């Protein structure tokens, strides 16, 4: 099954023929919302809005581990595509311009970076 995580501006998939929604509990807390299951053509898809339905969760509060666990372990997704949009600071790049960044400001510090953060579980490489 294919999982799609929608970022800002993508809180639903218009081409998704929805079959049901499901709330998934995870060992990492609550994901951003209920998972939406359905099909796009012949492809089974599960969708999750990263910032919650209604865009109520700011980026620094998104529970990334719960989202990934819910989609992979909870829903059985074997592939995950995440769609995102970002802001920019260059006036000469209009909205809709596709760029490949070569300098990145990383605001991901201060949050868990792994699913394996316990000394009780041996590291697997």
Task: Report the location of each language-model feature.
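Metabolite-binding pocket within alpha/beta catalytic cores that recognizes anionic/polar moieties
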Residues: 1-125
């Amino acid at each position: 099954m294919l999982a799609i995580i929608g970022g800002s501006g993508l809180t639903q998939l218009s081409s998704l023929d929805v079959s049901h929604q499901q709330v998934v509990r995870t060992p990492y807390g609550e994901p951003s919302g209920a998972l939406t299951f359905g099909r796009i053509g012949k492809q089974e898809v599960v969708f999750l809005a990263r910032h919650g339905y209604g865009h109520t969760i700011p980026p620094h509060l998104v529970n990334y581990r719960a989202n990934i666990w819910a989609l992979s372990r909870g829903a059985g997704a074997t592939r995950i595509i995440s769609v995102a949009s970002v802001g920019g600071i260059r006036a000469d790049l209009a909205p809709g311009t596709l760029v490949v960044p070569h300098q990145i400001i990383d605001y991901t510090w201060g949050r868990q970076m792994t699913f394996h953060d316990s000394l009780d579980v041996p590291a697997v490489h």
